[in-house]
Amino acid sequence: MTILAIDTSNYTLGIALLREDTVIAEYITYLKKNHSVRAMPAVHSLLNDCDMAPQDLSKIVVAKGPGSYTGVRIGVTLAKTLAWSLDIPISAVSSLETLAANGRHFDGLISPIFDARRGQVYTGLYQYKNGLLEQVVPDQNVMLADWLEMLKEKDRPVLFLGHDTSLHKQMIEDVLGTKGFIGTAAQHNPRPSELAFLGKEKEAADVHGLVPDYLRLAEAEAKWIESQK
């Protein structure tokens, strides 16, 4: 089985090729650039480097969000188009779960974080058990202050991952003290190779029914709905 993994859900643009249990190619950038004009060329480049054609792919795996609304849509649309045109399965993985996978060697809880503005974050709680990543608390959009108080009650070490942790480092330290750990710079980029491994084990989704998981409405949508009441 050869899997193509695609992640455009945040600043990170990640593409990976997984053949059986071997990562044969991986492309990652962390740049504030338009994924819509870079994602497909990156896929073609990676395939060409590996002397492969799209028809050699067995499955598509995509990061479904949360994250940048535009970024999530780009990745999901590209992945669905490829899966449909090639008539191969597609699986979707939480962007937070993908980031949490970077905490593989941490003995404790893992909280990946994307900033959601106004004191809110997208996050969830994960841990590794017997070498496998499992979800402890579902992904959600939550006030960071409330989230940290919940983590404090668990009284366990917590590893925070994601570039946006820099925005909240002081609050994390103030609430959790020595129980709060910030990941290294290398751990803050979600890796498409981890996305591929996670998606390999997930059931195939309906290619037409698969939609991004924003965890909340885009601001413009929310305002429109409110105006209709």
From Swiss-Prot:
Q: Name one Pfam family in it.
A: TsaD
Protein source organism: Bacillus subtilis (strain 168)
Assembly and interactions? Answer: Forms a heterodimer with TsaE.
The cross-references to PANTHER family, in alphabetical order and at most eight, read: TRNA N6-ADENOSINE THREONYLCARBAMOYLTRANSFERASE, TRNA THREONYLCARBAMOYLADENOSINE BIOSYNTHESIS PROTEIN TSAB
| Full protein name | tRNA threonylcarbamoyladenosine biosynthesis protein TsaB
Disruption-associated phenotype = Cells lacking this gene display a slow growth phenotype. Cell size, shape and nucleoid morphology remain unchanged.
Q: Which GO terms describe its cellular component?
A: cytosol
> Which classification does the entry list for the species?
Bacteria, Bacillati, Bacillota, Bacilli, Bacillales
Transmembrane helix among the record's keywords?
Answer: no
| Keywords linked to the UniProt accession | Cytoplasm, tRNA processing
Also noted in the record is: The four proteins YwlC, TsaD, TsaB and TsaE are necessary and sufficient for tRNA(NNU) t(6)A37 threonylcarbamoyladenosine biosynthesis in vitro in B.subtilis.
Q: Which family does it belong to?
A: Belongs to the KAE1 / TsaD family. TsaB subfamily.
The compartments listed are: Cytoplasm
